[in-house]
């Protein structure tokens, strides 16, 4: 699942 908001931004999402 993609998570592209600051609460869960990581090196593998955005």
Swiss-Prot record:
Keywords annotated in UniProt: Acetylcholine receptor inhibiting toxin, Amidation, Disulfide bond, Neurotoxin, Postsynaptic neurotoxin, Secreted, Toxin
Main subcellular location: secreted
Location relative to the cell: Secreted
Sequence positions bearing Cysteine amide: 14
Entry keyword annotation includes Disulfide bond: yes
UniProt note on tissues of expression: Expressed by the venom duct.
A single Gene Ontology CC term: host cell postsynaptic membrane
Residues of the signal peptide: none
GO function terms (MF aspect): acetylcholine receptor inhibitor activity; toxin activity
UniProt effect for mutating residue 9 to G: Important increase (22-fold) in ability to inhibit fetal muscle nAChR and loss of ability to inhibit adult nAChR that permits to strongly discriminate between the two types of muscle nAChRs
Cysteine pairs bridged by disulfides in the record: 3-8, 4-14
Family to which the UniProt record says this protein belongs: Belongs to the conotoxin A superfamily.
Any further remark recorded for this protein: Negative results: is not active on all neuronal nAChR tested (alpha-2-beta-4/CHRNA2-CHRNB4, alpha-4-beta-2/CHRNA4-CHRNB2, alpha-4-beta-4/CHRNA4-CHRNB4, alpha-7/CHRNA7, and alpha-9-alpha-10/CHRNA9-CHRNA10) (IC(50)>10 uM).
Record note on domains: The cysteine framework is I (CC-C-C). Alpha3/5 pattern.
Function, as annotated: Alpha-conotoxins act on postsynaptic membranes, they bind to the nicotinic acetylcholine receptors (nAChR) and thus inhibit them. This toxin inhibits muscle nAChRs with moderate potency (IC(50)=11 uM on alpha-1-beta-1-delta-epsilon/CHRNA1-CHRNB1-CHRND-CHRNE (adult), and IC(50)=13 uM on alpha-1-beta-1-gamma-delta/CHRNA1-CHRNB1-CHRNG-CHRND (fetal)).
Protein name per its UniProtKB record: Alpha-conotoxin MilIA
Organism: Conus milneedwardsi
